[in-house]
Swiss-Prot record:
GO MF annotation: an example: serine-type peptidase activity
Any single biological process term in GO: proteolysis
Subunit structure: Homodimer.
Domain of life: Bacteria
Enzyme class: hydrolase
Protein name as catalogued: Xaa-Pro dipeptidyl-peptidase
Function: Removes N-terminal dipeptides sequentially from polypeptides having unsubstituted N-termini provided that the penultimate residue is proline.
Catalytic-site annotation from UniProt: S349, D469, H499
One of the record's GO cellular component terms: cytoplasm
Family affiliation: Belongs to the peptidase S15 family.
Keywords recorded for this protein, A-Z: Aminopeptidase, Cytoplasm, Hydrolase, Protease, Serine protease
Amino acid sequence: MRYNQFSYIPTSLERAAEELKELGFDLDLQKTAKANLESFLRKLFFHYPDSDYPLSHLIAKNDMDALSFFQSEQELSKEVFDLLALQVLGFIPGVDFTEADAFLDKLAFPIHFDETEIIKHIHHLLATRCKSGMTLIDDLVSQGMLTMDNDYHFFNGKSLATFDTSQLIREVVYVEAPLDTDQDGQLDLIKVNIIRPQSQKPLPTLMTPSPYHQGINEVANDKKLYRMEKELVVKKRRQITVEDRDFIPLETQPCKLPIGQNLESFSYINSYSLNDYFLARGFANIYVSGVGTAGSTGFMTSGDYAQIESFKAVIDWLNGRATAYTSHSKTHQVRADWANGLVCTTGKSYLGTMSTGLATTGVDGLAMIIAESAISSWYNYYRENGLVCSPGGYPGEDLDVLTELTYSRNLLAGDYLRHNDRYQELLNQQSQALDRQSGDYNQFWHDRNYLKNAHQIKCDVVYTHGLQDWNVKPRQVYEIFNALPSTINKHLFLHQGEHVYMHNRQSIDFRESMNALLCQKLLGLANDFSLPEMIWQDNTCPQNWQERKVFGTSTIKELDLGQELLLIDNHYGEDEFKAYGKDFRAFKAALFEGKANQALVDILLEEDLPINGEIVLQLKVKSSENKGLLSAQILDYGKKKRLGDLPIALTQSSIDNGQNFSRESLKELPFREDSYRVISKGFMNLQNRNNLSSIETIPNNKWMTVRLPLQPTIYHLEKGDTLRVILYTTDFEHTVRDNSNYALTIDLSQSQLIVPIASN
């Protein structure tokens, strides 16, 4: 374990003493440091009628227990304080450590003893994470140190778990959206699942916009998947034009219906544990699946601003600008009289994507988004540089396949009976509009590109993204983060994992940092919390997070690729082609082992190479035919210890998100030896070699200069490392599987790898 503490708010002595007193710690500025520490420790054992017993189970020195120490005349020293602090946080002498000083250095322990600062040290200790993954104060509250009185209690600028999660209100409302996506002449109704604590105070809201939450149709999804085995189409030379079109909602009328009291209820919905954490701290949770999902009406428009509007309508309702009904019969309306109108959206992948789309509307009431692994351009999710390009792990998927997965209205037999014929008509229109044949950008994709509206974002923004996420690739966050207005507060966490959440990591206090931010933005707490704009997980060692100023630098280093002419054959034998198509993982293994069709260049680094941004391959290339696709991957190659990309559980259910509520495991990325690590990758239809809007011909056996931008990253390579460049055609995980008989030739003498370099 290593501390990377970003959530602690430096506090004055007077304020620290005041907050400790509010928690019931009987500390006195006039007492000695030793007396105050003893008083603090005894308070920790509030379950015991006699605190001597648990105190005797701690050691103050290697040869003296804590009870004996406090009964002695010995003075408090750094060694005693450190040893006791470690034990209070759950570290066991002789098990977790033998030499406290060395262990503290390894931990990067954030508290440095000064006898005159004991009150501040105790305050800091309470806000520091235990071995279990919870801060000490959260651990104490989870054990019942504070009663669940359904009111706010704060410590170090963060809300504590004092809301009763055993008496939650669970209710359903149906919000009227200014849409008619299925064109039935009726405004669409949006189902909203609300979970909120009982409270006399207006509550802020965490909203998870999740098209998955009302169920998914995996059978329809699998039937809709596309075969990837097809020839690469030769496209006609042309220029693509699109236009920015403002989304215009339909008109709605003020509701004059009576207020209803009898709301639909529910017992369970699959929740997001970060939401649960805040539910226990006085934040209502709502789950909204949007148009075309079970319980709602309309068509699943998948990614456009009509879908975004269905979520926006819910924020409007929370602020009194839209109507909600108690049921589909629309006999009574219901108002959000429990809400303070301020909303933060949460969720990963499609959920985080909807957060980004919502933010670009500039809707009033949306104070903040926490968007994890979020899409900012749907074209860049299902296409790349004029190619159909499947997200990592999902060959054959496209946006209409996702529509089939998430159109959960068809899971309700009655809805299927009444609406499936119309749904199939609209789905067919969507399938035609996305133009899988060419892979080109068009108006359909432009209408699903949130980047063009990034300037309208006015809420605070928090993004998290994995630099090993080949599902929602790093370009998605790179482009939106760098397009955000300079006038807003923005934060980016870049971790070394894949398509995963990061709130329950051991090495970073993400959960607590979000607590401090949300208390500022949604509760109006003046806590003076300041979070760095960008935090990056170091790839060279375990559990090390660093501040960064930018994602993408203008300083470049050009690396020569050699002097040879390299031939890349596209064609595989029938058996090999079928085997790779059946299991793309076998293809990846062969590719990285140098066995698949490829041109391979190894570069032994003579100095450190701190990459920050978008690597570009500038290549001199020719094709034997009038078509060609180019794929590239950059590897950190050779055996050494590296971070894994999938977090593993360190402890099971050690994190309590409230008071015995919604427990979850503590996780971390492992650090272990392997043979290589993918740094970046990229794909291009050579007919789109100059830009996305220009379709050009490929002259047979004529040299072309191609600039292939790879996925942006931040990655540190060290002197002596090997940077491996792999150039090839068909990628069996991502691209169409064209087995036609053509070849590409690369002139390495006129080719370079252009690397953006982080400044010192």
